[in-house]
């Protein structure tokens, strides 16, 4: 269970606060106006940016001071963060090791991850030889192989067309349910939230609000979200 206790994130003149309790094995969408700090929030949560005060707790343990690799979190970025000179197998294997040599056990783990995202037989392909959807699947396989209970997603499927994006969202939902993962997904598209998010958090006016049922939020969006969506 993820708790944020009076968390404050400062970057220059920008400031963001968040106090949340009891985020569990659900999919949470994070929405808000452009420039509200959604990506900054995820980066700080993952440990890539410092927090000014407050605490991040996982199952009651304070993890605020842990390095990114030590945290129970895996992050999927908008650009997939794949290395163009490495094969799909090697890109996924980076979740386990940076060494070039893979033991037979690790090779099987990588193959299993690629199989789970529908890319069996694509181990030798480099990112430039893959479609956008396939690249997203490679990145998702790498995240899955990290086997972390919290998944952080920063608009990972934005560059995909509607059909491919929905396919990836559905796959993400299935995998999250299988693993009982806590998923925080930044998105600018209300349809993404409606499709897979159990609850939605609004980030506006430098404050991250507590989650509410997604259907409820979209049926009667707060003023800031309504303005962002062009509904006011």
Predicted regions and their residues:
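Conserved ABC ATPase "signature" C-loop
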Residues: 205-206
């Amino acid at each position: 269970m993820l708790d944020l206790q009076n968390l404050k994130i400062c970057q220059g003149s920008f400031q963001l606060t968040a106090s949340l309790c009891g985020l569990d094995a659900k999919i949470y969408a994070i929405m808000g106006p452009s420039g509200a700090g959604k990506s900054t929030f995820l980066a700080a949560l993952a440990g890539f940016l410092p927090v000014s005060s407050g605490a991040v707790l996982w199952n009651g343990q304070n993890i605020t001071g842990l390095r990114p690799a030590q945290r129970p979190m895996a992050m999927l970025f908008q650009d997939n963060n794949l290395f163009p000179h490495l094969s799909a197998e090697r890109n996924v294997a980076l979740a386990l090791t940076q060494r070039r040599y893979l033991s037979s056990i690790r090779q099987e783990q990588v193959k299993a991850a690629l199989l789970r995202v529908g890319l069996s037989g694509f181990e030798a392909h480099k990112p430039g030889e893959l479609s956008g959807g396939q690249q997203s699947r490679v990145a998702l396989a790498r995240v899955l192989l990290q086997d972390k209970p919290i998944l952080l997603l920063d608009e990972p499927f934005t560059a995909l067309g509607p059909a491919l994006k929905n396919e990836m969202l559905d796959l993400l939902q299935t995998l999250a349910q299988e693993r009982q993962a806590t998923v925080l997904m930044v998105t600018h598209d209300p349809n993404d939230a409606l499709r897979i998010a159990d609850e939605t958090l609004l980030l506006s006016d430098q404050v991250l609000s507590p989650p509410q049922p997604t259907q409820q939020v979209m049926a009667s969006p707060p003023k800031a979200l309504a303005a962002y969506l062009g509904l006011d």
